[in-house]
């Protein structure tokens, strides 16, 4: 018996020591990651900046520990733009090598990057693009290059733009679940996926409009950069040249050559004027951006506000990076910027399809307070719609790209009626005991009464009136003028400027330039806000690793169906009244 307990104790001790050893090993790995990410590589003469345009592009770098552990390089608009500008001004960088793949990004982001690439070429430097499989958006950016190459067995996705919306009403009905909506706005179609079985005429109209606008922008840019007729490009898309032999892509002059990976390296070496047996001095985005030196003096603050607008933080953990605009946090940040005497103007970079109407109102108010202290300019990225437009409307000046999705001035409420599921499908019975007739308003076992539905609709109506009032105040319009462009309709930036919803077409640089002008600055620096959370902060603040790993597995296995799944799942945690865009949009 004594030997038995010795063996048990020894086993337990061994397991404990193994756990300690693995924990220490994990922390050593994390220290190594932190050290490697902070190390700056020296840039040598005749170097090439390698831009990997593959995967999903975020607004800013997300410090995602799982990506770091897997050696995955994050792709962000902010870091990409900085790298191109620094490469242009660095005499040691001879050119840019675009390593293009299945890029997924907002077209508005791509518009700004394409302009930066063209500006890079104006300095006399060159750009070479290579891809094994080009997405439409990846090719759009590659068209800015001096030469475009594709693998001999590669593919170029060129078939136009389109997509499918999924409608869940009939699926939910099979389980006795019914979604009830209260909304204002003919075009406010965000609820249709839950309450309808097909697309409405109004939604089809607005969707067709922005798809046509996007496609025309892509066609015009590629036609200009590649000197190909737009009608020809449209004909190639109708024929779906994606599935044709790669040689046809060369014949259509969409690329300049079909080569293997090692062959394109020799092309780059020839461009650099070095022998084939010499190594290329490659510089990454992180290398050229280096460690940012904190801005100490007067500057313009660039505040990044992107993701769903929520009332409170949803735990994301160290393995996720679904960025959110948390109403209370953004209000605190803007209050701090108002008090900071070194901040002379604020540019808010918005990329959001909306979310909580309550949080949007709080941010609108805080921007109003911020304007009393210094100029506020909004730079709209891929989307600044519904709640995203709500908060943007109060800026002194609004800059949007022609392809930005904006407007969607409307509000809805979405409520799940689970009474049939519980009482008929599951056999659960409920008994009410109450002091007033609506005391169990929204209880799980009962449907909404006509009186309760009327109350909900009146609540949404009040929210819509406030939304229109806020837009009218911010844009110096009458409520009647706002109503004509509201009704939940989505607009492109190129339409929004005609409707006085935005002031200027352009990108982030244009917004910064306008902010400097409003603040009467001639010499200034910029600084990004809010401060990004580091790996250590993520470790200290996160205890949801299991959920994060599960989420990563779901994302990997569901693929394109992950976003609709996440939308349905997230409804349970949404504020009941939403100012939200109709859909999830990502161009590939």
Tell me the role of every PLM-derived stretch.
Residues 3-48, 59-61, 94, 119-126, ...:
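Flexible, low-complexity junctional segments that flank or bridge functional domains
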Residues 17, 169-267, 419-499, 503-504, ...:
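Charged, glycine-interspersed solvent-exposed loop segments at helix/strand-loop junctions
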Residues 42-45, 292-298, 424, 520, ...:
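Extracellular/periplasmic catalytic domains that process cell-envelope and extracellular macromolecules
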Residues 47-165, 294-421:
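Cleft-lining beta-strand/loop regions that shape enzyme active-site pockets
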Residues 275-282, 400-401, 430-434, 480-481, ...:
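Acidic/polar loop patches that form or flank catalytic/metal-binding clefts of enzymes
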Residues 297-300, 304-341, 459, 530-588:
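Intrinsic disorder and flexible/low-complexity segments
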Residues 304-307, 350-352, 380-382, 395, ...:
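Active-site proximal loops enriched in glycine and acidic residues that flank catalytic Cys/His/Asp
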């Amino acid at each position: 018996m004594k030997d038995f307990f010795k063996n048990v104790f020894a086993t337990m001790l061994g397991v404990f020591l193994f756990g300690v050893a693995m924990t220490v090993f994990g922390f050593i790995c994390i220290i190594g990651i932190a050290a490697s990410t902070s190390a700056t590589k020296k840039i040598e003469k005749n170097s090439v900046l390698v831009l990997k345009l593959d995967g999903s592009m975020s607004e800013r770098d997300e410090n995602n520990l799982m990506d770091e552990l897997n050696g995955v390089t994050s792709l962000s608009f902010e870091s990409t733009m900085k790298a191109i500008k620094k490469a242009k001004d660095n005499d040691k960088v001879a050119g840019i090598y675009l390593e293009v793949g299945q890029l997924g990004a907002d077209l508005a982001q791509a518009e700004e990057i394409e302009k930066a690439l063209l500006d890079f070429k104006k300095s006399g430097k060159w750009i070479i693009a290579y891809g094994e499989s080009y997405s439409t958006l990846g090719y759009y950016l590659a068209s800015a290059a001096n030469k475009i190459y594709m693998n001999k067995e590669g593919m170029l996705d060129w078939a136009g733009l389109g997509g499918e919306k999924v409608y869940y009403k009939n699926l939910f009905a099979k389980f006795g679940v019914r979604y009830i909506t209260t909304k204002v706005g003919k075009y406010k179609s965000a609820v249709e996926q839950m309450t309808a079985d097909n697309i409405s005429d109004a939604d089809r109209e607005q969707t067709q409009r922005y798809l046509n606008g996007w496609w025309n922008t892509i066609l015009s840019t590629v036609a200009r950069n590649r000197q190909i007729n737009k009608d020809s490009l449209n004909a190639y898309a109708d024929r779906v040249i994606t599935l044709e032999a790669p040689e046809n892509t060369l014949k259509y002059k969409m690329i300049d050559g079909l080569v293997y990976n090692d062959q394109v390296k020799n092309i780059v070496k020839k461009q650099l004027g070095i022998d084939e047996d010499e190594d290329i001095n490659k510089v990454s985005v992180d290398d050229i951006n280096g460690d940012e030196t904190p801005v100490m003096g007067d500057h313009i603050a660039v505040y990044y506000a992107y993701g769903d607008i929520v009332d409170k933080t949803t735990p994301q953990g160290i393995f996720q990076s679904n960025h959110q605009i948390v109403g209370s946090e953004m209000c605190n940040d803007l209050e701090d910027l108002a008090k900071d005497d070194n901040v002379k103007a604020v540019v808010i970079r918005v990329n959001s399809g909306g979310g909580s109407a309550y949080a949007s109102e709080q941010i609108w108010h805080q921007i109003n307070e911020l304007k009393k202290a210094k100029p506020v300019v909004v730079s709209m990225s891929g989307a600044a719609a519904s709640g995203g437009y709500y908060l943007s409307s109060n800026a002194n000046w609004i800059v949007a790209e022609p392809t930005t999705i904006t407007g969607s001035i409307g509000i809805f409420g979405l409520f799940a009626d689970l009474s049939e599921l519980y009482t008929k499908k599951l056999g659960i019975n409920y008994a009410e005991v109450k002091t007033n007739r609506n005391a169990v308003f929204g209880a799980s076992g009962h449907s909404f009464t006509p009186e309760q539905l009327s109350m909900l609709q009146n609540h949404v109506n009040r929210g819509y009136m406030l939304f229109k009032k806020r837009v009218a105040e911010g844009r110096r319009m009458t409520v009647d003028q706002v109503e004509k462009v509201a009704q939940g309709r989505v607009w492109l930036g190129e339409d929004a400027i005609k409707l006085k919803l935005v002031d200027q077409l352009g990108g982030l640089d244009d917004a910064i330039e306008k902010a400097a002008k409003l603040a009467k600055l001639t010499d200034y620096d910029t600084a990004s806000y809010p401060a990004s959370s580091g790996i250590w902060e993520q470790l200290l603040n996160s205890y949801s690793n299991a959920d994060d790993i599960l989420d990563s597995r779901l994302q990997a296995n569901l693929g394109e169906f992950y976003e609709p799944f996440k939308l349905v799942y997230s409804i349970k945690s949404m504020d009941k009244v939403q100012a939200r865009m109709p859909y999830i949009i990502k161009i590939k």
